[in-house]
Curated annotation (Swiss-Prot):
Name the record gives this protein: Ribosomal protein S6 kinase alpha-6
Lineage, top ranks: Eukaryota, Metazoa, Chordata, Craniata, Vertebrata
Enzyme Commission number, as recorded: 2.7.11.1
GO BP terms: central nervous system development; DNA damage response, signal transduction by p53 class mediator; negative regulation of embryonic development; negative regulation of ERK1 and ERK2 cascade; negative regulation of mesoderm development; signal transduction; TORC1 signaling
GO cellular component: a single term: fibrillar center
InterPro entries: AGC-kinase_C, Kinase-like_dom_sf, Pkinase_C, Prot_kinase_dom, Protein_kinase_ATP_BS, Ribosomal_S6_kinase_II, RSK_N, Ser/Thr_kinase_AS
Annotated family: Belongs to the protein kinase superfamily. AGC Ser/Thr protein kinase family. S6 kinase subfamily.
Gene source species: Homo sapiens (Human)
Places the protein is found: Cytoplasm, Cytosol; Nucleus
Length: 745
């Protein structure tokens, strides 16, 4: 089934729900909708919030472990802010986990109502008990006279709400992954006797790989067993189950209704029950029929119907998570692999080095982190939070981290603000390379004296946002250059990366008098594996010339190879500018878009073929030297003729020649993909390749000049796309719209 067409701002749209007796159908915003006849639960009028009696606090601090205090944490950035507290990115300064990054939730006691104080204590108690791969972990909890502190996992991926509303188109298969992980997380809480009660996208975070982490337990309630019910009125109204709205008492089954709301929203971009105000929304939850989008698969519609049962006893999940797991919608989920985090997530967040906050709202991250002392609370406040402090039992064993020193502390990436200028942090040195839109220089970090490279891009000539995002998202791959810092002074953008001290790959190869097939195969394997990774993620490099493949260090080992300079790289996007997941690409993208993407990917492979040829032959396939004219080179490329005989070729294996001929095939559709390269016997059996090294003449300067001439000719021939300013994209325009307020802090 074709997924829901994305709107400009799907989270803010309201879905009309048809009223009246019997089933009916119609269209909402051009989409076919069918009213679902829904069973009637016990309707009751909606009440205002009153005084709620919460359960007593019974947990106490674990003894025998070092207690934490605010002085042990270095404030780095503000991640979020609410009416009674902030969430900071912090770095631990002492102890066995020195250098580790955490999220620190700081709550002012004086600002908390009694209800909120008990919820905060409850959140701490619940987190102490919980240990699950898809639930955020509490590492420390402590208090001062005026504040409460929760030290939690720092999840670099941000929240699912941000990802969904701003960047990505998901398919049913993608949504299924998140829902399956979420089902396991909810089940774990339910087995502990905990009702979550506040399930919404803002409370589902992503780690740097893309797995979920459920967070924010301030509204959760522990119950003794399944028969016990809670009666408090809490949660985000659009996600409330009918029994929560009418206050007839609710149990863990209420979470599965909210789970259905989340599923509906992730699949359609709209909420199933949303009125013009709070009261109308609650009345719709109690009485309205569900408008079921007909573009959803039969399995998805079936699961939604079974989750949206107003009688909690009839709701799927009321008898436990196995009911959910057995539903046909999840038929292809391997639950054991999923729990072990062995299933690849559909989307990798754009998070570079460990302390990046790229996925968090710049409204907060641009602020200077400051934890004010906080007014003392009332005299009995400390008594209320007695036993609040906690230290995770495994803290010493879990972190085998080198204590932090000035040598390994680097500044925080300046993506979302100009807290520091480039010149204040780094000292510029000599040029490394000069291009049409940028210059690359060596630089030295002022504090640590460490060497880096900086690419300085003129914003008036090129929009660097796509390059930055790609490096943020994929720069943690071992063979892709790592982005360390980003600065923007208005005219120029400074991209600080590792300094490639080993130099260009081709230079190192040409300087060797001898070079074996086994060495060439090792190098081609590493590069092809990296390119395959990028292509599988919908990223094409489009400028994979030898000067952009370098060695990280002087060892010149294959593992130290890095693909650099993503200035021409592109991520696959829909017409509205949203990123497309690999699943979306495979199923729903227009053929002409895929053809362009396939053409770009084939160009990457052709470039690898030119490099491969030169590694084996000691000269380039289409240019004889630096003085060849562009017309001569392009004519040879156009004819697709290159020699595989004479000279060194007489000593090269047939397997190498076969692979090379497929990589340099004239027809992009018949040219090998990176995946096919990796499956070729010359790569898979590279340990059996000859290790003898045919001697070559030292003509490295001629070969290098010929290579430069080849790519210069291609540049003359090929029209390079002019990128519009990022502000002109639909994605940027959507981001500038008024954001929906989060209550998740």
């Amino acid at each position: 089934m074709l997924p829901f067409a994305p709107q400009d701002e799907p989270w803010d749209r309201e879905m009309e729900v048809f009223s009246g007796g019997g089933a009916s159908s119609g269209e909402v915003n051009g989409l076919k909708m069918v009213d679902e006849p829904m069973e009637e639960g016990e309707a009751d009028s909606c009440h205002d919030e009153g005084v709620v009696k919460e359960i007593p606090i019974t947990h106490h601090v674990k003894e025998g472990y070092e207690k934490a205090d605010p002085a042990q944490f270095e404030l780095l950035k503000v991640l979020g802010q609410g009416s009674f507290g902030k969430v900071f990115l912090v770095r631990k300064k002492t102890g066995p986990d020195a250098g580790q990054l955490y999220a620190m939730k700081v709550l002012k006691k004086a600002s908390l109502k009694v209800r909120d104080r008990v919820r905060t204590k409850m959140e701490r108690d619940i987190l102490v008990e919980v240990n699950h791969p898809f639930i955020v972990k509490l590492h420390y909890a402590f208090q001062t006279e005026g504040k409460l502190y929760l030290i939690l996992d720092f999840l670099r991926g941000g929240d699912v709400f941000t990802r969904l509303s701003k960047e990505v188109l998901f398919t049913e298969e993608d949504v299924k992954f998140y829902l399956a992980e979420l089902a396991l997380a909810l089940d774990h809480l339910h087995q502990l006797g905990i009702v979550y009660r506040d399930l919404k996208p803002e409370n589902i975070l992503l780690d740097e790989i893309g797995h979920i982490k459920l967070t924010d337990f301030g509204l959760s309630k522990e119950s003794v067993d399944q028969e016990k019910k809670a009666y408090s009125f809490c949660g985000t109204v659009e996600y409330m189950a009918p029994e929560v709205v009418n206050r007839r008492g609710h149990s863990q089954s209420a979470d599965w209704w909210s789970y259905g709301v989340l599923m509906f929203e992730m699949l359609t971009g709209t909420l199933p029950f949303q009125g013009k105000d709070r009261n109308e929304t609650m009345n719709m939850i109690l009485k309205a029929k569900l408008g079921m989008p007909q573009f959803l698969s039969a399995e998805a519609q079936s699961l939604l119907r079974m989750l949206f049962k107003r009688n909690p006893a009839n709701r799927l999940g009321s008898e436990g998570v196995e009911e959910i797991k057995r539903h046909l919608f999840f038929a292809n989920i391997d639950w054991d692999k999923l729990y072990k985090r062995e299933v690849q997530p559909p989307f990798k967040p754009a998070s570079g080095k460990p302390d990046d906050t790229f996925c968090f709202d710049p409204e907060f991250t641009a602020k200077t982190p400051k934890d004010s002392p906080g007014l003392p609370a009332s005299a009995n406040a400390h008594q209320l939070f007695k036993g609040f402090s906690f230290v995770a039992t495994s803290i010493a064993e879990e972190y085998k981290i080198t204590p932090i020193t000035s040598a390994n502390v680097l500044p925080i990436v300046q993506i979302n603000g100009n807290a520091a200028q480039f010149g204040e942090v780094y000292e510029l040195k000599e040029d490394i390379g000069v291009g049409s839109y940028s210059v690359c220089k060596r630089c030295i970090h002022a504090t640590t004296n460490m060497e880096f490279a900086v690419k300085i891009i003129d914003k008036s000539k090129r929009d660097p946002s796509e390059e930055i995002e790609i490096l943020m998202r994929y720069g943690q791959h071992p063979n892709i250059i790592t982005l360390k810092d980003v600065f923007d002074d208005g005219r120029y953008v400074y991209l600080v990366t590792d300094l490639m001290k080993g130099g260009e790959l081709l230079d190192r190869i040409l300087k060797q008098k001898c070079f074996s097939e086994r060495e060439a195969s090792d190098i081609l394997y590493v590069i092809s594996k990296t390119v395959d990774y990028l292509h599988c993620q919908g990223v094409v490099h489009r400028d994979l010339k030898p000067s952009n493949i370098l060695y990280m260090d002087e060892s010149a080992s294959a593992d130290s190879i890095r693909i650099c300079d993503f200035g021409f790289a592109k991520q696959l996007r829909g017409e509205n500018g949203l990123l497309l997941t690999p699943c979306y690409t495979a199923n729903f993208v227009a053929p002409e878009v895929l053809m362009q993407q396939g053409y770009d990917a084939a160009c990457d492979i052709w470039s690898l073929g030119v490099l491969f040829y030169t590694m084996l032959a000691g000269y380039t396939p289409f240019a004889n030297g630096p003085n060849d004219t562009p017309e001569e080179i392009l004519l040879r490329i156009g004819n697709g003729k290159f020699s595989l005989s004479g000279g060194n070729w007489d000593n090269i294996s047939d397997g190498a020649k076969d692979l090379l001929s497929h990589m340099l095939h004239m027809d992009p559709h018949q040219r090998y993909t990176a995946e096919q390269i990796l499956k070729h016997s010359w790569i898979t059996h590279r340990d059996q390749l000859p290790n003898d090294q045919p001697k070559r003449n030292d003509v490295s300067h001629v070969v290098k000049g010929a290579m430069v001439a080849t790519y210069s000719a291609l540049t003359h021939k090929t029209f390079q796309p002019v990128l519009e300013p990022v502000a002109a994209s639909s994605l940027a325009q959507r981001r500038s719209m008024k954001k929906r307020t989060s209550t998740g802090l």
